[in-house]
Amino acid sequence: MESKLAASLAEAGGERRGWWLYLLLCEGDRLYVGIARDPDARLAVHQSGRGAFYTRLNRPVRILAREWHPTQSAALKAEYALKQRKPEEKWSWTIERGPSLVADA
């Protein structure tokens, strides 16, 4: 995954293009899956109460993990697949991403 990201950044002149699949930890140990070009900015929107309905009811605490995708279509497919998983499988997905793709606390 890192080489795909590096290649895309080089092609884009160093700009981060593409989409991020992200997993949020919300209050009550609930999980939320979404995609965004800038997951940190999207987290701020969710935390302000202007994001998805789910995150208005279950305020996000932090980003647990993120995974880069070159296109919105690829990110949407990955989002759908992750949303189909059980909560314990989503936690495993977070661990599988490894330190290079797991967001800082």
What are these regions (language model features)?
Residues 1-60, 66-68, 73-83, 87-88, ...:
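GIY-YIG nuclease catalytic motif and its immediate N-terminal context
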